């Protein structure tokens, strides 16, 4: 039977979870990263033992093992922080800034401003995300093109997130589902034992320094946004993964005859944590089966199209695995540099959707994000603008640029030019 007479309090809790799951699905239609959440966590895990943990102990020699375990939770929280704005109660303006404007400078600010073990681990997680996007997105863009021949005919061998949001979401989530299916990800119990934490103070400082805005200028309720993000990362997205494994059961069985159901089910459960992590997953109960029923029944129209994942082919999975290997290699190199004499690294400001250097007309979303930022700064009378931010914006809007970018009206362009003119005459720091 689909349901087995669960008690009313469990039904109420399930209804709340269902609302949150659908909320994340609908919010997911607004944006995504090069990888889905589980892959971002796995990047941290793949570098943890031989790079991140030794770096933390080197920088904070008095940290205990318990301190290091707690720092791991902040690394997990940091590795998806650039996507905070895409979750319910977030703001796409926040995530657009972190992906398209001074993407490298923001991570450098986190690393520079981190003043304790937890905030530094959080910054390292954000570094992992930056590298994952810059190194991973070109491969994912090619995988989307291969998975959707019509899009390939329209856009070419690479299909960017801006060119088709839903195709990216479905492709990236499909990579995660298959990796869970093959038992390649770190145990769900381990993720949940470690937890997910956000270092709000360092996030606020780095955001203000990088963008000349307060965090609550773009996140109307930062605490609610962060709390929902943590809930989504630790509970709701694993629930969605588990539902996807149920709904795609037949296709996964067909692809892998040795399929073992227990290893396909992903769920975080604090109450059932065991010291031996293994790959044991809870069997689908009435909640999972009902969620799967809802997902299968709802018409895949509008934002709900994103709920219908695209499973990778051998060719696209190879692209994914290659990109993960490259990401981890680059991440380890940067971590080794951080342990060097200067303790600093230089990160280029790249468009996190394409991996290319950020420049005018390179990417429509970058153009739109710069325009909105400079207008917002003008609205605040440029109060928090630093010389570095001013120089970055002035470089983006070079003096020889007189025509508006694609898809921007002449009226909107005039507003941008007025704001840029006000910024040009500013002398921050004097």
Regions found by a protein language model. Give the residues of each.
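Short, surface-exposed recognition loops or helix-turn segments adjacent to catalytic cores
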Residues: 216-224
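A short structural micro-motif
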Residues: 130, 223-227
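Mature extracellular/secreted ectodomains of secretory-pathway proteins
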Residues: 128, 241-242, 256-257
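Catalytic glutamate of the conserved HExxH
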Residues: 126, 130-134
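Eukaryote-specific, cytoplasm-facing alpha-helical/coiled-coil scaffolding segments in long proteins
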Residues: 226-236
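N-terminal, motif-rich segments that launch catalysis or mediate targeting to/interaction with membranes
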Residues: 31-121, 134-217, 246-251, 260-430
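N-terminal secretory signal peptides that target proteins for export/translocation
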Residues: 1-13
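Bacterial N-terminal signal peptides
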Residues: 15-27
